[in-house]
């Protein structure tokens, strides 16, 4: 699970947080593997050993993504995972999610970024007041059509 606001231990470093949460999940990685995971999630090498309380929201989000990926789950639940990420990091996240999906993982993501969803996911569901009002395959709708559908359902 990757929440919109990742809760990390502020006085631990990024790599210490990753190591801690991996161990809680029964994963005991060496330092090189932990670094590889953080790099794959877009965190800069120079930031690995900085305390998390000095991180931006986007940097904390990258550590949260790394924690989820390190657990090697079959199902990932994401709540606004690109929140706080710059456009490059958001594109990197999309690539990571596509790779996970292609390797057989199921991904359920809540997001208001309908354009990112379209390029990342296979299916789209639109919720309104907690109810699924529209479901479609991403290959069956253009970006403009998706925008129009979203606007139509969000009126009122």
Regions found by a protein language model. Give the residues of each.
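Conserved ABC ATPase "signature" region
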Residues: 19, 23, 31-47
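Catalytic Walker B motif of ABC-type/P-loop ATPase nucleotide-binding domains
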Residues: 76-79
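Helix N-cap at the start of a conserved alpha-helix in ABC-type nucleotide-binding domains
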Residues: 87-88
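H-loop/switch region of ABC-family ATPase nucleotide-binding domains
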Residues: 111-112
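A short, surface-exposed alpha-helical micro-motif characterized by mixed small hydrophobic
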Residues: 117-119
């Amino acid at each position: 699970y990757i929440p919109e606001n990742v809760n990390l231990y502020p006085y631990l470093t990024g790599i210490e947080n990753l190591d801690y949460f991996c161990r809680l999940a029964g994963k005991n990685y060496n330092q090189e593997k932990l670094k590889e995971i953080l790099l794959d999630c877009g965190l800069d090498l120079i930031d690995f050993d900085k305390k998390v309380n000095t991180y931006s929201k986007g940097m904390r989000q990258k550590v949260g993504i790394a924690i989820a990926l390190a657990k090697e789950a079959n199902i990932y639940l994401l709540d606004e995972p690109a929140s706080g990420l710059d456009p490059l990091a958001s594109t990197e996240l999309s690539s990571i999610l596509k790779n996970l999906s292609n390797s057989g993982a199921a991904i359920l993501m809540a997001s208001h970024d309908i354009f990112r969803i379209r390029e990342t996911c296979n299916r789209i569901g639109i919720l309104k007041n907690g109810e699924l009002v529209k479901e479609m395959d991403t290959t069956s709708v253009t970006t403009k059509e998706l925008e129009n559908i979203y606007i139509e359902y969000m009126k009122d």
